[in-house]
Amino acid sequence: MASTKEKLIAHVSKEQPAGPTNKVTVVGVGMVGMAAAVSILLKDLTDELALVDVMEDKLKGEAMDLQHGSLFLKTHKIVADKDYSVTANSKVVVVTAGARQQEGESRLNLVQRNVNIFKFIIPNIIKYSPNCILLVVSNPVDILTYVAWKLSGLPRNRVIGSGTNLDSARFRYLMGEKLGIHPSSCHGWVVGEHGDSSVPVWSGVNVAGVSLQALNPDLGTDKDKEDWKSVHKMVVDSAYEVIKLKGYTSWAIGMSVADLCESILKNMHKCHPVSTLVKGMHGVNEEVFLSVPCILGNNGLTDVVHMTLKPEEEKQLVKSAETLWGVQKELTL
């Protein structure tokens, strides 16, 4: 006897099974992972989303919750499992898993705890998606991007840290608040470490091509009567402030991740401040990952933009590198 489905549908041709073309995996279904997953779904970036976590009940619950919203999405397949085989053939793998940053804890304090987690995660990702682009979000992101690069064996263009993409977004938002202008019209870059020793490039801050430093030569210095330096201080303090108020950060970093995924999956050749290997650049001699302006496309990180930094900015960048290297060289990989 024919089933309801057979009575309803008349097959015209046999469907040829085809794999996903823009599959994205998110490893870790905590607050950041789910904010990233939702942001990716709402941007219609992927034809298949895979979620992975060791906490099976939470993983299943988050996946079901997203699947129940399928009517409102254009991603037709959302899958989840603690087994990494579910991630097979991913174009981009977003790694958010790791120990959560506690109130008042620096990102660098998190490091060895998360390195040990990465020793399990990264080989499993590569086993099932050897051609993927790794986007590392877990903190401390610059060191863990280096760790992912070492553990994965992937070329440097395919291991990217979310870096200061969010720091720069925070900077532009706060700059816009000070000027009464939308952040998209406020241009400024925060480079270096994602976190406490990040470097604001005051020499490049502009609106409509008008350099703010040309209008205010003391911009960003202690002599500045308008105290623009406090804008960067607020960028550095903002994560700690949000954690203090709500216990974690999630939405802004989730949107930042989706922004980076869009540039990769749509081959946009867009410039982002993301974490990459900077040895040999700007006086950095150590094998460290720091954020500099990079072009992102289908092959991952395709180019690095040569910034013109003032001596004091370059000095800060080198100091950032030395801070990270001091921690990195002690790691057990």
Swiss-Prot record:
Taxon lineage: Eukaryota, Metazoa, Chordata, Craniata, Vertebrata
GO BP annotation list: lactate metabolic process; pyruvate metabolic process; response to hypoxia
Location relative to the cell: Cytoplasm
Family the entry assigns: Belongs to the LDH/MDH superfamily. LDH family.
Entries under Gene3D superfamilies matching the protein: Lactate dehydrogenase/glycoside hydrolase, family 4, C-terminal (3.90.110.10), NAD(P)-binding Rossmann-like Domain (3.40.50.720)
Keywords: Cytoplasm, NAD, Oxidoreductase
PROSITE patterns named in the record: L_LDH
InterPro entries: L-lactate/malate_DH, L-lactate_DH, L-lactate_DH_AS, Lactate/malate_DH_C, Lactate/malate_DH_N, Lactate_DH/Glyco_Ohase_4_C, NAD(P)-bd_dom_sf
Entry-linked HAMAP family: Lactate_dehydrog (MF_00488)
Signal peptide from the UniProt entry: none
One of the record's GO molecular function terms: L-lactate dehydrogenase activity
Residues reported to bind NAD(+): 30-58, 100, 139
Known catalytic reactions: (S)-lactate + NAD(+) = pyruvate + NADH + H(+)
Matching SUPFAM superfamilies: LDH C-terminal domain-like (SSF56327), NAD(P)-binding Rossmann-fold domains (SSF51735)
GO CC term, one of those recorded: mitochondrion
Name under which the protein is recorded: L-lactate dehydrogenase A chain
Protein's organism: Danio rerio (Zebrafish)
Protein task: Interconverts simultaneously and stereospecifically pyruvate and lactate with concomitant interconversion of NADH and NAD(+).
Residue numbers annotated as active site: 194
E.C. code: 1.1.1.27
Pathway assigned in UniProt: Fermentation; pyruvate fermentation to lactate; (S)-lactate from pyruvate: step 1/1
Binding positions (substrate): 107, 139, 170, 249
Enzyme type, top EC level: oxidoreductase
Subunit and interaction comment: Homotetramer.
